[in-house]
Amino acid sequence: VLGPIIGGFFAGADSILGITGWRWVFLVNVPVGLVALFIVARTLHVSHFARPSAIDWWGAFTLVVGVVPLLLVAEQGREWGWTSPNSLTAYAIGVAGLIAFIWVETRMGNAALIPMRIFKDRTIAIALGGGVVVGSGMFGGMLVIPLYLQIVHGATPMDSGFQMLPMVLGMMIASVVSGQLMTKTGKVRIFPIVGVLLMVIALLMLSRISADSDIRGVMALMFLFGLGLGNTMQPLTLAVQAVVDPRDMGMATSAATFFRQMGGTLGVAVFLSVLFNSVSDNIKNAFVAAAKDSSFVAALSDPAVLANPTNKAFVTALSTQDTSAFGNVLADSSVINALDPRLAHPFKVGFATSMDLVFLLGAIVCAAGLFILLFMPEVHLSSRSAQQRAADDAAARAAGVAGPTTGAQRTVTHDLVDAVTAEAGGHSLDELPDASEAYQTRPRS
């Protein structure tokens, strides 16, 4: 809830303690992270059983080689040119790195950074693949909303943070409600599908807004978009956690976040490229249309307007067909708020038109993600933890029973595992992370 507001406050500050304001958006996470680390260390007490394992150094190295060049070209591609030698080199290195990563992971087995075996599960493969696509459209669309509020409606960074609270509220409500419903029903599949559908609807409606749209209507659409976000992100992660082998729980959870963030990074880069590649032409078209507007024409010769140096410099550049006036605005959009509203309106129309295109592309990408998620099988949440499931399954195998156990049978296996683990060190069933290994190493009687 506080994130957009605090971020807006820092972004709007020139300097805090001698440090540029926007840098505090990152620095503030340091003390917050330290406090969170302290709380976790003091309150979270989970039994740890050390197991010998190899570190997948080659997997980590090839993943970095594959991802970093792609992130670099995503960040710099608009400046370099998407088909420039620098970009093509980054593409080649990135693809080669990812191919090498897959080759390494298939040979590392259980020690792999991301074991390839998890992709054999249809639910995991679809959740991760859909997460990449949805993340691309989701983060791309989210990025444009504050730009619309600040450039088109003239909001300060902090004001735009307040205006985005409906989206945060929608996320909170949807997260809580979907969490309660998933707990009661044990079903997950429907929630990300509904969530992405809501995002598609919200983005389609956002693609219809203009420079003159009522901010209250825009905030209502942000709330709808937030409802979609709240129904999507956590359920997709839960779907992966529900079906993955307990020993792969941490890896699969981090992989789900990683894939979604990677999709978001690429989406942001592509959508920003679309925005700024189209905005110049849209602004020029808006000024051509404004030349037929009597109020705009009157402002060009209004002495009160020309008394402002910013207005006068812009009108002079416009009358001499100096295109640098447009470039200055693209380099620093805050100039728009310094202009007379009649002179600034074509700029806002041009930006709004380009943003509409980005919202539309976001809706199309999210719709593609929705199509992928439709193929995800139903996932049923378990009332037992991953540790308990692993222990019960191991106990069933030790007792000569195939598969997971329930009911009275589960009571017997609990007693059996407790007896064996007590002999091994006094740990109870719920403390046992992977009882299967204990039975594999103990001789059968």
Question: Locations of the language-model features?
Answer:
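Helix-loop-helix hairpins in multi-pass membrane proteins, especially solute transporters
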Residues: 1-59, 85, 169
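Small-residue-rich alpha-helical segments with characteristic i,i+4
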Residues: 2, 12-15, 141, 147, ...
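Transmembrane core module of solute transporters
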Residues: 31, 58, 72, 80-251, ...
